């Protein structure tokens, strides 16, 4: 409710085999959530940020 996913899930569930559609929908939502932009606020980490964080963590561990 109040989520962008609720509309897509409701529309997909109304067609074909509910079990098969549900599995495919859950997988795609999971992937979308990793890259979703909620009202101008980016949710998730871009690959550059992940690389920076991992390099900083290595530096902290060495010192």
From Swiss-Prot:
Transmembrane portions of the chain: none
InterPro entries registered for this protein in UniProt: OCC1
Positions with biased composition (Polar residues): 1-10
Region of interest: Disordered: 1-37
Classification via Pfam families: OCC1
Family, similarity comment: Belongs to the OCC1 family.
Protein name in the entry: Overexpressed in colon carcinoma 1 protein homolog
Native source species: Rattus norvegicus (Rat)
